[in-house]
Regions:
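Active-site helix of classical SDR
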Residues: 128, 164, 172
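Conserved mid-core segment of classical short-chain dehydrogenase/reductases
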Residues: 77, 100-114, 137, 157-160, ...
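Substrate-binding pocket helix/loop in short-chain dehydrogenase/reductase
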Residues: 104-105, 112-117, 143, 208, ...
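Short, small/polar-rich loop/turn modules that mediate ligand/substrate recognition or access, typified
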Residues: 180, 185, 242-244
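Short C-terminal tail/terminal secondary-structure segment
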Residues: 2-6, 153, 232, 243-257
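Residue(s) in the substrate-gating loop at a strand-loop-helix junction
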Residues: 148
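Conserved glycine-rich cofactor-binding loop
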Residues: 14, 21-23
């Protein structure tokens, strides 16, 4: 193995990815496993989680399943503490759990606002805190929060989602500010528009797809596999002095008007 390859090798590391039974989370789990990490996949649907685990194991990955509700602070702490005690340390955390709800802001349901806030922001706090407490004791750890282009930009009909992703970007900075002194690196990845279950309605909309392809300098939707390079970098020794940064993987959409 060359020095360059060793810098990004995740062999011997264990990575927890929340919301990883499908979409971006599954792609991240697959990519981290291919870089050498054992992966801990998470979700509330045990059947989907089992299916995801089978697919990853077929590809040769070492997989653990941890089906907790990331919105439940007590359940998160119990699950993380039990895993650390019975299986081993979590070296890398990807806070990926998220949801979307589209509606005009003046008609946006209050209960949907609460759900999106809990799912997109509270989960980052819940899981980040539970895992960081163990990382701090060891003096090392990598946390990567999944933000969005909506961390910086807004679109009609998704104002609460935009607010939550802005919060993720700033919570990332806050985590880095508090935890860097303990040897942790906390960063975020902000995906652009990718072909995922969360974006299924948009992918199926010819008018939106045409607008997106014109708006994005790269001229196309992103493929989830294109997030893996950023994920491996921020999980590896190659990012040892990168902290509090949000890395946009968006085909250039936030760089242009």
């Amino acid at each position: 193995m060359t020095k360059a390859n060793a810098l990004f090798d995740l062999s011997g590391k264990t990575a927890l990815i929340t919301g990883s039974s499908q979409g971006i989370g599954f792609a991240l789990a697959k990519g981290l496993a291919e870089a050498g990490a054992a992966v801990v996949i998470n979700g509330r649907d045990k059947a989907k989680l089992a299916d995801a685990a089978e697919k990853l194991e077929t590809g040769g990955a070492t997989v653990h399943r941890l089906p907790f509700d990331a919105c439940d602070h007590g359940a998160v702490k119990a699950a993380i503490d039990d895993f650390e005690a019975s299986v081993g340390p979590i070296d890398i955390l990807f806070n990926n759990a998220g949801m979307q709800h589209r509606a005009p802001l003046e008609d946006f349901p209050a209960d949907a606002f609460d759900r999106i806030l809990n799912t997109n922001v509270k989960t980052v706090f819940n899981v980040g805190q539970a895992v960081a407490r163990h990382m701090i004791k060891r003096g090392a750890g990598k946390i990567v929060n999944i933000a969005s282009v909506q961390t910086s930009l807004a679109r009609p009909g998704i104002a609460p989602y935009t607010a939550t992703k802005g919060a993720v970007g700033n919570l990332t900075k806050g985590m880095a500010t508090d935890w860097a002194k303990y040897g942790l690196q906390v960063n975020a990845i902000a995906p652009g528009y990718f072909e995922t279950p969360l974006n299924a309605a948009l992918v199926a909309d010819p008018e939106f797809s045409a607008w997106l392809e014109k708006r994005t300098p790269a001229g196309r939707w992103g493929k989830v596999e294109e997030l893996v390079g950023a994920a491996v970098f921020l999980s590896s020794a190659g990012s040892s002095f990168v902290n509090g940064h949000t890395l946009y993987v968006d085909g250039g959409i936030t760089a242009s008007l």
